[in-house]
Amino acid sequence: MEKGKEYLMTGLLLVACLAAPQAYVVEGSGIRECLLYHFTHENVFHLILNFMFLLRYKPLWRSTLFGWITASIAAYMPICAMDLPTCGLSGICYAMIARSNAYQKRISWIAVLSNIPMALVGVFNWRLHLMSYLISFISWTVYLRVRNS
């Protein structure tokens, strides 16, 4: 694959993060916030951490689009609501990891168990990360089984 194509989605996500209106997910958030919160970051460090993953992962458009949809659905679920506002690309990143894991027919226990320290700290929306991962993994597993049968 060409180098330019490998980094295209990462570049487009960076532009979206810089250009999109500020949006946060809190309890009772509407569809608009659930669709846009991914592009808001708490600070530059938060943005850099997400993009370090993306630069390594080099997502393609299908992974990115499905990750965005999956993380947006997870954000709309009441179980993922927190008192603190949620923002960032992490839900999309977890959904993209799940897509790769579904193709490999295995669960990434590192991705799943990484939520334990986040739950203990209390300022990270670990439920959103976990739901994004699970929804994406289950969806892709079902899709792949239907496609291959």
Regions found by a protein language model. Name each.
Residues 1-149:
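A detector for small-residue-rich transmembrane helices and their helix-helix packing motifs
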